[in-house]
């Protein structure tokens, strides 16, 4: 009994478990605590889903044509430092300028012996199977 009051623990089937905490203000009385008090947010309205009043601001957009043609703007990932300077075209690999930046090619435009053809064919068959199986009843 004395250890129960002193240490605030009881013997349970699983082992020693916390029972109640001692209240230092009142000696000898035990105080049961519940969950912690919910934090109060500044500018928040009462109720669920209250939005704070802080608004996000957009990043600064560079409009200087000299900087836009000599630096890769917005590529620097560090807080401090400069943007990456652009190199001459001869220093970049050749495949970089051969990339298809437009819409993807259709099956008729691709060579049947290429890997891209078979990947595209497999993707279209998966899309077709998903469309057909969406309407099936269980």
UniProtKB/Swiss-Prot annotation:
Name the keywords, alphabetized.
Answer: Mitochondrion, Ribonucleoprotein, Ribosomal protein, Transit peptide
Subcellular location, in the record's words?
Mitochondrion
Q: Which InterPro entries match?
A: Ribosomal_mL54
> GO terms for CC?
mitochondrial inner membrane; mitochondrial large ribosomal subunit; mitochondrion
What's a BP term from Gene Ontology annotated to this protein? mitochondrial translation
- Which positions form the organelle transit peptide? 1-14
| Any one GO molecular function term | RNA binding
Is Signal a UniProt keyword of this protein?
no
Q: In terms of one coarse class, where is the protein primarily found?
A: mitochondrion
What is stated as this protein's family in its record?
Belongs to the mitochondrion-specific ribosomal protein mL54 family.
Subunit structure and binding partners: Component of the mitochondrial large ribosomal subunit (mt-LSU). Mature mammalian 55S mitochondrial ribosomes consist of a small (28S) and a large (39S) subunit. The 28S small subunit contains a 12S ribosomal RNA (12S mt-rRNA) and 30 different proteins. The 39S large subunit contains a 16S rRNA (16S mt-rRNA), a copy of mitochondrial valine transfer RNA (mt-tRNA(Val)), which plays an integral structural role, and 52 different proteins.
Protein name, entry field? Large ribosomal subunit protein mL54
Gene expressing this chain: MRPL54
